[in-house]
Amino acid sequence: MLRPEQMSKVSVAGSTHVLTPVIEAVHDAELVHLSDYDGGIDGFDNGDPMTGADEAAEKLVTVRSLKSLLDVSEGDAGPTRIVTDDALDTELESIRVEATDLDDRRSELTDDLRAVIERIDAAEPFADLGIDLDLLSGYDSLQVAVGTGDQSAIDAALAASDRISAFETFTGQDTIGVFAYPAADDDAALDDALVGVPFTRLDVPDADGSPEQYVSELRERRDTIQAEIEDVDDELAAFRDEHAGFLLAAEERLAIDVQKSEAPLQFASTSHAFVAEGWLPTSEYDAFTDAIESAVGDHVLVEELERADYKPTGHDQHVPADDGADAATDGGTTASFDETDSPPVIQDNPGPVSSFESLTEVINRPQYTEIDPTVVLFLTFPAFYGFMIGDLGYGVLYALLGFWLSRSFDSEMISKLGGVAMWAGGFTALFGVLYGEVFGLHLVTEYLWHGALGLADAPLKKGLHVSAFAELWLAASLVFGIAHLAIGYVFGFVNESRSHGLKDAALESGGQLLLMAGVGVWLFSTHMQSGGGPRPELLYSVVALPPIVGKAGLAAAVVGLVLVTLGEGAAGFLESPTYALVNTVSYTRIAAVLLAKAGMAYVVNLLVFGAYETHLEHPETIDYMFGLFSTTIEHETHFMLFSGEAHGEVLFPGLMHMGAAGILIGVLVLLVGHALVLALGVTSAGLQALRLEYVEFFNKFYEGGGEKYNPFGYTRNYTTED
């Protein structure tokens, strides 16, 4: 789980006359992640595409263009089929011609519709004016302007102009028509008179008669075109339904053909021989050699060149294979393409853990040579999240949301995130049972822990009403941080020791680990604490280590500081407080979010149901955490769920007990309030948990940048060869 699946580099060499069957066999095996040839073998060049590659690529472009034109989706697929060469020549061309014709018709109609709509928009102001269109132009001496603006300003400007001898304005609801006689033979008299006046001129449509009739005719034309477009859309839909299955199958067939025909571009080739190299899982090597030998017999040489080690030395270090699969050859070579060729990464995680690969890949896929942190994410992220939310009701909803995501989308990433949500919801529900809460109400406590099991209270409390738990969780958050960071530093130590040696690992992660762990141990010890020391007493609610352990912690911290300073110089010394304590303190956000979410749910329920507080006459000591933790309770808070009757000091009477209007408002507050708490659980608890993973944990060891395993081959969904 902490390492990717081991990979082997293989070579397939042979004569060019068996190139085609070898490519077919490698493609069908779908095991080899091909390496690109970079010209490193004397006498060998990159191969050329096989015959028909260009034609297949052109047809593939055509098919994908038709899929886009017809809006074909995976849901339109029919039964699997065999796509013949004849079908790719004749049926595809027939579909292209008819689909293009339909698309051209639709484009023409769309252009016509756009033009008609523009003419309607231009003519509607004239219909508002109500003057026949042929009366708005064509005069020798009368000048006309139609537009929108301020009529009083227009009248004033025309009256003041000595270039206008007479004028009259006509108005509709929004449109103004201006008719004016110039004082002399002055073609620009009206235009000049309107300069500076709030007036936007409109072009008169090239039409005669009533503008209302003209607009009506245009609208009829618009409706006709829209109906024709709908008819073409129906034809396109029917055409898509008829041919979608073929297009999907043709795309798959052509994609496979292009993939196979362009494969030699990655090979080393001469006119007589070829060499192909790539990576496959070591466990699949025997199956691969059997597949090749079954296809071409002893006409190729298949060799396991090396098995990739997990120890990098500058570039990835590879170790020779234990043995090779010998076969005869017609004249090839097994020289390596590129000594720095890194193996692709197959993360080797079991089913439940694999969902959390989606969180790892948000940063990057792990390198082949570094530890895969996915299993730690699986163990810690749901626990952090569930601990901070801790509610049975919210947990069930998160789990249902995750189940829906995992089953409703084809995306592998979304499906994996759904798995993460289910685990987070499960832990939220688990902690909710331990806290005794469902949607912030203590019903689990009342009916399970107190009613069925006879306990005085739930095993855990969030600290909102039992303040001792607030201090406990604050201290426990530091312990969580120390443990989490220690794992990160150990991973970093392992990675660095394998890549740079033990000395560098000790000066880097080793020093930081000793510094952080040493200070952490001292914090929880009683060294220098007698009579009230420098540390808050709340730390000892988790653990109180003896002074001798504290002294050992300080000694380890000093050693760590020396190692960090030797490794990083003055910068390391200046950053030592961060290594020692700052990163650890960052984990107190766990307790902070826990209290914040509990407080939000409490406020919602307080407003809706109301609550009262009872002060105990005799404070009661209650055992929590199944006897591991005890505290004294002096008061209790109870929600008034089923009646407004209070047996103590009323904190708020509750909307549900304020009549019909209060009930309606209360239901609204209940639904909206808990929906908000549910959503903020993702944006606060979720993001804070991710921050601890990515910023605090990953930064101690993780680089990422591994290449995804992408074997040469194709998983058929729409075609069959049988």
UniProtKB/Swiss-Prot annotation:
InterPro entries, per the entry: V-ATPase_116kDa_su
Source organism, top-level taxon: Archaea
GO cellular component: plasma membrane; proton-transporting V-type ATPase, V0 domain; vacuolar proton-transporting V-type ATPase complex
Keyword Nucleotide-binding carried by entry: no
Main location: membrane
Region of interest: Disordered: 309-352
Parts of the chain that traverse the membrane: 384-404, 419-439, 474-494, 505-525, 554-574, 590-610, 639-659, 662-682
GO BP terms, alphabetized: vacuolar acidification
Keywords: Cell membrane, Hydrogen ion transport, Ion transport, Membrane, Transmembrane, Transmembrane helix, Transport
Basic and acidic residues compositional bias, start-end: 309-321
Lipid bilayer topology: Multi-pass membrane protein
Similarity section: Belongs to the V-ATPase 116 kDa subunit family.
Role of this protein: Component of the A-type ATP synthase that produces ATP from ADP in the presence of a proton gradient across the membrane.
Protein's recorded name: A-type ATP synthase subunit I
